[in-house]
């Protein structure tokens, strides 16, 4: 063994590498750095919600995805280059690798996808999520002590989004003049995303109100914040979000030893929210669809007055509660008694529910069986958009899931391609409603990526779960370890991740960028931190590290020597471990620099790839504009450019065919339509457009009948499929023909 390795300074040198240092400018205090980072995170999450909304608008969503790719790459590059982050052990690497494999598999599915253009878009979305996940892990390495900033940012952004959603009720004339639904859905245009955002906000603000550290005035803001989020959640009528919030709260109160403080904040804020929600549910102007603007405005203004009163009262109560808890803290005996009372209340809830079920017709068995049948019945009707929806058990998810399993049967092992569910589902749907997602991560993944994709998802989930358990200290042997502020914060972030996970399991919130990045950021930070026992040991011994060694270990990327090396401590010719670490750290980090450059290059390539469908849409719009101006040759040229930018989509080919038809070049138009069919043969619309051209323009009823037959097979529930087939049949002299079951 060398003298360096055997030096008695080796443990100290290891601590020097592991001792965390906040990423802050010398002129900024830690509190100011936390405030700035909190504001930046809140702005990022809120901007994601308002710009990308529900993730269904291609251009706006793509811009958000590119932004996350860039931010994530820069954070990863900084973590690879800066010594204070590079010297740490790479915690959470297996989970990150599994996530990367899932993203790569999503992109590879384009090869066999039945809807390759949608698979391209979904691969870009997944790479953006991977960038957000990896970037958050890098930030946790760069600024390990700034974990409160993430919780602050989550809470603040959720309050902003929830507040905006509620304001659309308060001022419908200015913010939601054309709204027809009573349920809150702004800014996502999807009510369950509003509910999930509010649920995440409740958990993050629960930590803020229950924590022992921090400024009491800031902690008091948790009271009105939680109440506002709860009002938004309830007015969205989102049952899935309520379920997710319940799971998150049960986990938080079961794990975090701040139950009394948390219960006081949660119950107090919920009492204020319950009063407002109860009044709102009784108002026709707030709970009925398709009402005149005047009726909605009158009720909305009254709601605004009540909300303002609620916020003021809860702010005062929060300040008073914080002052009393600081001046007269509860004794250990009082906390123990209160904890038992809370436990008794929790136990009492299922008892009361069981009594109510037993008293209902059919008893417990009958009621449970009835609820289960409604929940799993594919033919169940959609519950009305009223407050009664919150207690209804029927759902159309069973229908979407059954259709997803039918799609999965087309290609069980590798799937039909990422995002192909929306296209292939038309073949199996039982109604005329168009649905893009299966409303559940598991059925959606089975349909799109098959058993292989689900296996990769479960692998990533399992590796993340194990790392999270170790980081929070949930193993039995770690329960007795101290609950410092960071451990409470990590448990709260884990609860946020659970809320998102439960919601995405029963809904399509995985595809909503703001919802996804909130949950992924919380999940990533947790596993980027060391296991609890190791972190506590390093924190306890970090003060023993000499300041000179800490400054060297966390010095700049590359600089000349600034002092003479220390004397030999292990015999003639040997050097100290600190000196060896210092000398090695001063050499330019070629390998990390290459890795950082590679990460940035991959992010740039992914961003450029994600932007191509948007560029294709722009070119297609320009082609139509040239056509309207009479510049037919230019329109054809630009339409071909659109196809070159997105060769996997049939839409540029449809535009090209339209322009060629206007030019009178029918053969070229037919060739473009046939190429669209070859590009996406599982899409009924490609066959339908080809058949319409063959029947109406080329007067080829026999060819049109064959095309319409394929369209009917792929989308039999579409009224256009039936009418087109019958029209082509009559043109072929077969007026009594019946649409076939197979092409």
Regions of interest found by a model, annotated:
Residues 1-108, 114-121, 131-157, 207-225, ...:
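Transmembrane signal-anchor hairpin modules in multi-pass inner-membrane enzymes, especially those
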Residues 655, 689, 724-725:
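Canonical tetratricopeptide repeat
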Residues 647-648, 681, 716:
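Short coil turns that delineate tetratricopeptide repeat
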Residues 641-642, 675-676, 710-711:
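Canonical positions in the second alpha-helix
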Residues 55, 110-112, 159-199, 209, ...:
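Membrane-interfacial helix-loop-helix modules of multi-pass inner-membrane proteins that assemble, modify
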Residues 256, 451-491:
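Hydrophobic transmembrane alpha-helices and their immediate junctions
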Residues 173, 190, 382-436, 442-445, ...:
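TM-adjacent membrane-interface loops and short helices in multi-pass inner/ER membrane proteins
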